[in-house]
Amino acid sequence: MAVLVSLACLHMVPAHAQSTAPRNAHAALPEVVVSGSRQEQAADELPLSYDVINANTLSNQQSRNLREALENLPNTSVKRSPARFSVGGATASAGRDGNVGINIRGLGGNRVLLMTDGVRMPRSYAFRTTTFDREYLSLELLKRIEVVRGPASALYGSDGMAGLVNFITHEPADFLAVGKGETPKTLGGRIAAGWSGDDNGHTLAGTVAGQASDTLQWMLTATTRGAHAMDNMGTNHEPNLNRTRPNPQDDRDNAVLGKIVLRPHATQRHVFTLEHVQKKSDVDLLSSRNPLPLRGTPAQIAGAIVDEYSSRSMERNRLTWDARFGLGTDWADHLRTVVAYQDAQSRQVGTSVRNTLPLRVRDNSYGESTWQAGVQADKILRSGGWAHKITYGLDHVRSDISNLYTGLAPLPPEVFPLKRFPDTRETTSALYVQDESVHGNWSLTPGLRFDHFSLDVTSQAGFYPPAKQPGQSLSGSALSPKIGVLYRATEQWSVFGQYAAGFRAPDAGQVNGYYENAAEQVIIIPNPDLRPEKSRGVELGVRGRLDRLSLDAAVFGSHYSNLIMDTVLIRGTGTAADPRIFQTINTERARITGFELKGQYDWGRVAGGRLVTPFSYGKARGVNRATGKPINSVDPAQLALGVQYDTAAWGLRLDMRHHAAKTAKD
C-alpha cells in the first residue's frame, strides 16, 4: 500500500476569474472536445469515457510533466524511470527512459495513440538496455489535454488500441479574448514562472499574441526549464555501487510554438503551426562505479568501472497546415484538410571508463520523419425524426524510421557502426465514416474504419550484414467498427454504452530486430510473420450533473488477441553450442476488466472562497487467457482525493493519492 499526499498548489488567480454568484456543476460553459468524434462536440454528449485537462488545471496543479498532469485520472498512469540511460555497471538494467509512456486501462506504450493537434507523435522504441521515450512535448504550450479511454481505432487507426491522448496547443484567440462590452485586444499574452523543490527545477514561459488585421492573428510562445536529479530518501553519498542518493543530473528543456491564423473569408480558416521541442539530460553515474579498493578476479578488476557518465537528448520539429472550409453543398457542409511534417530525433550517449580495459562508449540514436495528410467532411441530414451528422474522410501517414548504434569497444561478434533493424518506411492509408444520429433523448453513433498498412525496408546498409538474413517487409489491413449509444434519462442523468474494436500493427523493430552477443550466448532474431494486435472493448457508464455533484462512472471489459510480446525465449540453454534464442512473438488471448468513477463535489462558498472536493477511483484486472496468469502491465487500484479552495486572488489545493499493493493475483 502506498499513500502520497501533496500540498503543491498555492496559486494566484486573476480577479476577473472569480464569480460572485453561486456556482454549480453547470455554471461554466459546456466542455468541448474534438478527440471523441473528430468534431467539436460537447463532452457530455459522447457515448464513451473521456477526460479533459485544461490549461488552468495544469497551472493550478503546477504540473511540470506528463506524469503529474495525468496522475489524478482513474485507470491512467505514466511510467517513470528516473535513473535514465546508463552503459554498464550496476545500473545497466535500471530504468533510464524518463516518462516513457501512458498506460490506459492496463495497456500502455505504443498501444496508446499520442497526438499533438491531431498529428501523430513519435512512437517509443526499446531494445535491451536502450529505450527512447515519447515525451516530445512541453506542457507550457498546451491549451488542454484530451484523454479517451478504450479502443479508438475506428476513428484514428493503428496504435489506438487501448486509448488515445490528444495534446491541443494554444491559439492566438486564447490571449486576445475579452469580456462582453470590452474593447477588442490587438495585443495580448502572458508570463509564467515556477520553481520545484524536489528537483530544484525552474520554469520560465512567455507568450505574445496579436491581431494584425481583421483576417490575421499571430502568436509566439517560448518556454525553458532547468532541473536536477529528483530528490529521494537515500542517505549514502558514496560515489560507488553502494550509493543510495540520486546521481548528479542536469536537465534542460526548451520549446517554441508559433501560429498564424488566417481568415480570408467568413467560410475559411487556415492555421499554420511551427512547433519545436528540445530536451537534454546529462547524468554523472556515480552509482555505477566499483568501490575502492578494487577486488575480485583479475578479469573483474580489469573491467571494473571507475567512472561512467551519460547524456540523453531528444528533439521534435513540426510544421502543420490546418484548413477548414464552409461548403454548404449536397455532399458536405464543412471540409477540413490537414497536412503536417514532423521530424523527431533521439540520442543516448554513454561512456564507461574501465580500470585497465579500453574505454567503452555507446552512441545510440533513433529517428522518425513523418508526413501526415487528411481530408475530412461532415454533413447534417434529417430523416423521419432523426438528425444525422455524417463524418467521413481519409488519412494517409508515411514515416521513415531509422536507428544507428556506434561507439567504442562493442561486444563480439558485433562491429560498430550497425543498425538493430534496417531503415524502414511505414505507410498507412485509411477510409473512415461515422454517423452521429439523434432522436429525442437518444443518440446512436456507429462508425467504421478500414486501414491498409505496409512496412517496407528501404535500405539494408548497416543491418545485413552483420544480420544473418536481410530485413523483410510486411503489409496487411484491418477493419475497425464501433457503435455507441447515449440516453438522456433526465436533465441531470444520462447513461451510455459503447462497443469498439482496435488494432496495432507491428513496428520495424519488432519485425526485423536483430542482436547477437557471443559472451552471453544470446541471439535475438527477427519475426517477419508477426500479426497485428487486435482488441474488442465494451463499456457501460452513467453521468450525473447535479447542482453540487458531478459524477462519471463506468464498467468496462476488453478482449485482446495476437498481443505482441517482445524478446521471448523460444529455445536454447545458454551454451556456446546451444545459445538462448529470443524472438518477438504473438501470444494467445487476454482479457482486462474493471471499473472507474470520477467527479467533484462543490461545497459552495466558505469564508469568501469556494470549496470543491475532486475525487477519482479506478480498478482493473487482466488475465492471460492461455496461461491464467495476471497481466503485469495492469496497475493496482488507485484512489485520488483532493480539496480545492479558490478566492478571487489566490487558491489552495491539497491532493492525496492511495495506491493499492500489487499482489500475486494481480
Predicted regions and their residues:
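N-terminal periplasmic accessory domains that precede
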Residues: E31, L66-A69, V100-N103, M115, ...
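Extracytoplasmic beta-strand/coil segments of soluble accessory domains associated
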Residues: R67, E71-R120
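Short acidic/polar hinge/loop motifs at secondary-structure boundaries
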Residues: I102, R120-P151
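Periplasmic-side early beta-strands and strand-to-turn transitions of outer-membrane beta-barrels
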Residues: A173, L187, G194-T203, T207-S310, ...
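Membrane-embedded beta-barrel scaffold of Gram-negative outer-membrane proteins
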Residues: A193, A227, D333-G350, R488, ...
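Flexible loop and strand-edge segments within Gram-negative outer membrane beta-barrel domains
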Residues: N247-Q249, T267-D330, A344-E368, L411, ...
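Structural signature of Gram-negative outer-membrane beta-barrels, strongest in the C-terminal barrel
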Residues: A387-K389, D395-V397, P422-S558, G609-S616, ...
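Gram-negative outer-membrane beta-barrel transporters
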Residues: V438-L444, F453, S550, V555-I564, ...
